Amino acid sequence: MSKPILFYAETCPDTAPFVAELDRLGVDYDEVEIMTSLPNLKQFIRLRDSSAEFDNSKANGYLGIPALLLPNGDVVLDLSKLKVIF
């Protein structure tokens, strides 16, 4: 993976501000809309089930999107961390 991958759902209210911040920062990323296809959803579930970054989201009944998977394997769920990373 050479650039980040954004896992999101178009209907999620947190997606638009997350995308706006990525765009403001000029981040080039690939998109995976998890609600439009079963393979996309499965790809996200595999990530969510294998990354400790999602533990808090799962414990509180949240899906954990939007989620930005970085090339180094780290996952960013918090919009405020984007400006620190980029």
From Swiss-Prot:
InterPro entries in UniProt: Thioredoxin-like_sf, UCP037291_glutaredoxin-rel
Name of this chain's protein: Uncharacterized protein HI_0926
Organism: Haemophilus influenzae (strain ATCC 51907 / DSM 11121 / KW20 / Rd)
